[in-house]
Amino acid sequence: TIRDILDSRAISIVVQDTELKETLDSLGRKPSLVITDSQVFGRVAKDTPHDIPMTSFSILFARYKGNLKSLVNGAQAIDTLEDGDKVLISEGCTHHRQCGDIGTEKLPNWLKQHTGKNLTYEFTSGTEFPLELDQYKLIIHCGGCMLNEREMKYRMKCAEDAGIPMTNYGTAIANMHGILERSLEVFSDL
């Protein structure tokens, strides 16, 4: 969090993705890290020089929760999807979906562009989470910020027990934009 950054006596600069390139160019020195919202991973990766580490909030959150390795494995399963496979896209909150919604519009579009496959989708939100997961080839879950740790671990355990790969939005998006490896470079233990 920004509070953690301040407590570490570091400097935090917050900008819109459209302001990133100009901000980086104006700094007297390179930042230690760029952290982005997953939805703009592609643009931020293009605007961030390769010698500056870059990751996303959802990847950091997954690392903090201790489940990043399994989510990375789940993201890599995207590349094994075939025509007709069913993907569950699950959100922990029940926000009002708008045009351009990440879960119901952007992720399916990115999956189609990345895989070239005709996939089918099921969407859940809030407390909804299917008991039977065998019908899915992949589960893509939000970061779970509105779910307590116990609920998120329960969902991951259900997927593991069913043998279904599970990933989160940020890790999946990084994989589909070809920047998963780059977004994980900040973690020496992966």
Where are the regions a protein language model picked out?
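P-loop NTP-binding site
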Residues: 1-190
